[in-house]
């Protein structure tokens, strides 16, 4: 037995631990009736800084081919930057400068959705990126800011937003149509996945730890995050999602991974921040920009 070999008992737990300290530990899950362990917990490392610090923008793409665009106020509101896995370079400028928007798609087929233009105007504008320039797309049915977004340029999804609202809209590459309403109206939330298999998590209801899953027509309750927060970022897909950063009672470094039913704590960000953007997957995520005590240009992989 393990006790005979190393002089220690194996803990018996009714549920799996959700903290990063579980890495390397062995326990017996009495509910599942099996021994379990965590061999590895994800970790963040520094990437190349953006050329312009910003917060409340949006992102799209992958860890090695990402897009950062928008911000609230200042010249950075129209700026786009492209990431190649090590550094950022200047891309085409948005036609409508804005922050508190949502993003979707890829570096060469991006989608900028809604947002807030100074001084305090909510916009329904959608723009499409082709790898070098932005052009106008179909307007949202309901103009909003502080919303979540995911999917692709030709199959996008927008959900939640100021109010807060429970409204969901689906994009086909030219026009938005109404989708199924969120179970709970919320804003400052994050999302991941596709138009027909998405997850929305966190946000302000007030601040929540809840997640919801979308099947292309309706939302159902998903797993509960370990850290309640808003103004966070997300990446991945519905069955393998990543939630990171945001604001709880203060800016947080917390990172969590979702397996389709449960959230588990993972390696923390080096820099606590809210209003950040994300891209990539659970195993190759990208966190960039945000607000610490000032706008940030930091990137983490």
Residue ranges of model-derived segments:
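Polar, enzyme-active/binding microenvironments
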Residues: 1-301
């Amino acid at each position: 037995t393990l006790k005979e070999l190393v002089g220690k008992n194996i803990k018996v737990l009714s549920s799996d631990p959700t903290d990063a300290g579980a890495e390397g530990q062995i326990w017996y899950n009495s509910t599942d009736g099996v021994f379990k362990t965590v061999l590895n917990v994800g970790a963040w490392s520094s990437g190349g800084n953006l050329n312009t610090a910003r917060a409340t923008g949006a992102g799209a793409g992958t860890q090695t081919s990402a897009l950062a665009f928008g911000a609230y106020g200042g010249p950075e509101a129209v700026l786009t930057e492209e990431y190649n896995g090590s550094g950022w370079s200047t891309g085409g400028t948005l036609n409508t400068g804005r922050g508190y928007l949502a993003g979707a798609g890829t570096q060469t087929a991006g989608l900028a959705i809604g947002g807030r233009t100074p001084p305090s105007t909510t916009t329904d504008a959608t723009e499409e990126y082709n790898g070098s320039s932005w052009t106008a797309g179909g307007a949202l049915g309901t103009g909003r800011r502080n919303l979540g977004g995911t999917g692709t340029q030709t199959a996008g999804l927008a959900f939640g937003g100021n109010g807060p609202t429970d409204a969901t809209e689906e994009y086909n590459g030219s026009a938005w149509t109404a989708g199924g309403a969120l179970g709970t109206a919320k804003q400052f939330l994050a999302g991941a996945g596709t138009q027909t298999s998405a997850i929305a998590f966190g946000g302000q209801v007030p601040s929540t730890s809840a997640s919801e899953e979308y099947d292309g027509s309706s939302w159902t309750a998903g797993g509960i995050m370990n850290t309640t927060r808003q103004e966070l970022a997300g990446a991945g897909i519905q069955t393998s999602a990543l939630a990171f950063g945001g604001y709880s009672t203060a800016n947080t470094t917390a990172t969590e991974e979702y397996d389709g039913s449960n959230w588990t704590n993972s390696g923390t960000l080096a820099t606590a921040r809210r209003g950040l953007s994300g891209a990539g997957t659970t195993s190759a995520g990208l966190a960039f920009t945000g607000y610490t005590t000032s706008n940030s240009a930091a990137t983490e992989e």
